[in-house]
Amino acid sequence: MWLQHLSLKTFRNYKETKIDFNPKLNVFLGRNAQGKTNMLEAIYFLALTRSHRTRTDKNLIHFDEEQLHLSGLVQKKTGSIPLEIELTQKGRVTKVNHLKQARLSDYVGHMNVVLFAPEDLQLIKGAPSIRRKFIDMELGQIKPIYLSDLTNYNHILKQRNTYLKSAQKIDETFLSVLDDQLVDYGCRVMNHRLDFIKKLESFGRKKHFELSNQIEELSISYQSSVNITDKQNLSESFKIALEKSRSRDLFKKNTGVGPHRDDISFYINGMDASFGSQGQHRSLVLSIKLAEIELMESITTESPILLLDDVMSELDNTRQLKLLETISQSIQTFITTTSLDHLQNLPENLSIFTIQDGKAAVNGN
């Protein structure tokens, strides 16, 4: 798939911009704070209805406006798909083929993206919430039912936590009803995640072995607050975990176990990767990103769109060449950079856009 056209209206520092893209490589060139990353963020937001930089949607709206509008035309094997997002103070409206979508799971997945940015190194050493978000964003694109199950789980979780905080006297029967619903959707979420991690590890192990000159083996482990060793009895394991945590939950007035507390760990040759060198971290994250691309292709039969936010200068020659191999294949790529000096080996079929003060101008093909 590839993004043919993008229209931005009052998004970040873009007042109104319309731009047509190259199906292969697109380079956003400009000084810092001109809007290069904002352009990538717009593409990411159009795909996922979420920003990778802020949790507060109103930060995306131009400072003197009350709403924003994004639209794009995605080309896929099955034809063209127009996508639209309108964000106001009241919320967001999403449209596919000009038809309003009632649920997030009905919208996400029509345009798949893989983002690689310097902050992705936090995937290794950052907080567990960063890794959970990574799973949610990637898995949600290839398996829409996951977003539906996750939304339902979070709804029940919020209900349970609110009840724990507000109830003067706990009704054990009512709490058990909430627990049953939490277990139902929680097990679905965990099963989706376990399947995803297994596939990601398979692709990632191969990529990392190549990047490390056949000396490092990558493995990924899903760390759960629930006993996940026996998937057939996952529901029973979750119930037992909730029962054991009930006294703690009543005291702290929140839910201590479940997929909202889970994490993933990365290992290099059996050792915790968080203790590795910065070079190993870069290789590991690059391996994961390249694995994401192959995983998405294997499931959707479409190549995702690759977004590279100022990462080429962060990579050594070996890692750059590996990334360029991927770019040279049939995958649309967007790169932000302040200079073309370290992009000498890029494919010839590319478009360069100069970004200045929230405006984009084509200056090379």
Curated annotation (Swiss-Prot):
GO CC entries: cytoplasm
Role, per record: The RecF protein is involved in DNA metabolism; it is required for DNA replication and normal SOS inducibility. RecF binds preferentially to single-stranded, linear DNA. It also seems to bind ATP.
Pfam family of the protein (one): SMC_N
Biological-process GO terms, alphabetical: DNA replication; DNA synthesis involved in DNA repair; double-strand break repair; SOS response
GO-annotated molecular function: ATP binding; single-stranded DNA binding
PROSITE patterns reported in the protein's UniProt record: RECF_1 (PS00617), RECF_2 (PS00618)
Primary location class: cytoplasm
Binding-site list for ATP: 30-37
The UniProt record lists the keyword Cytoplasm: yes
UniProt keyword annotation of DNA repair present: yes
Name this polypeptide is given: DNA replication and repair protein RecF
Localisation: Cytoplasm
CDD domains registered for this protein in UniProt: ABC_RecF
UniProt keyword list: ATP-binding, Cytoplasm, DNA damage, DNA repair, DNA replication, DNA-binding, Nucleotide-binding, SOS response
Family: Belongs to the RecF family.
